[in-house]
Amino acid sequence: MALTREEREQFLTEPHVAALAVTATEQDRSPLTVPIWYQYRPGGDVWIMTGLNSRKGKAIAAAGRFCLMVDRVSPTVRYVSVEGPVVSTVPATREQLVEMSSRYLPAEKVDGYVDFAWKEHGEQVVIHMRPQHWLSSDLDEV
């Protein structure tokens, strides 16, 4: 059963690790699909953080759009997939790294991870995607 707009947006606000899919830059390859942290607030854009020169960063820049899919298996099987165009790519800030890390890590791990990532991951960008196409389902009724 498809989710309502409110249900799918609420599910996307939860801290699931997403599967990001984007057209590969190599012509003879399937889409690049990788796990990624993301941030979303209902009615807004989805944003991700990645390396400026990472494979996914380059692929997203070339394609101009990408897809995220999040799912769960309990208490019911549910997924939400959202796809759309990139609306901005900007240099990442330490504050954004803290926000994203706080979403996924236990509070006592955030500072250490942020210090490590800020020093070791190289130049990062924040990519904003405007949700344009949604797919969703929950198998609660099955």
Predicted features, each with a name:
Residues 54-56, 75:
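Short, surface-exposed beta-strand-loop junctions and turns on beta-sheet-rich folds
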Residues 15-52, 60, 66-70, 79-82:
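Short beta-strand segments
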Residues 22-24, 71-75, 108-116:
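A short, aromatic/hydrophobic, helix- or strand-capping loop or linear motif
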Residues 1-16, 76:
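Extreme N-terminal tail/first-helix region
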